[in-house]
Regions:
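A common structural junction motif
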Residues: 72-76
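Short S/T/G/P-rich N-terminal loop/turn motif that feeds into the first structured element of a domain
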Residues: 1-50, 59-68, 78-105
Length: 105
């Protein structure tokens, strides 16, 4: 599995409510997305950063989404291009499902 952490600077006019509204309106497009296990939206008012944490089944699944078009969409929507960092994610503890997921790396 791969975790991608996406961050982008937020303009001053995007407060917590506006960020939540923007995030909620984009959330449906991530449902049933090939290879996406889970997504968390991030908002840091103090540092003016937004973003997401994505858990993917594979790097190929992540790369299929993070296209130049997707990056342009994020830049237009939030006012800044995204910074994407990838991490191998060999083990996930999921207390909600009472499971430990281990990737055969």
């Amino acid at each position: 599995m791969i975790t991608a952490i996406v961050n982008f600077k937020l303009p001053a006019e995007i407060d917590a409510k506006k960020a939540t509204d923007l995030f909620k309106s984009s959330a449906p497009k991530y449902r049933a997305m090939k290879g996406l296990v889970r997504k968390y939206y991030l908002f840091d008012d103090h540092n003016r950063i937004g973003g997401g944490v994505y858990l993917w089944k594979s790097r190929a699944d992540a790369d299929a989404v993070y296209t130049p078009q997707w990056k342009a969409y994020i830049a237009e929507r939030y006012g800044a291009p995204p910074d994407i960092r990838y991490f191998e994610t060999p083990v996930v503890v999921d207390n909600e499902s009472d499971k430990i997921l281990a990737d055969a790396a």
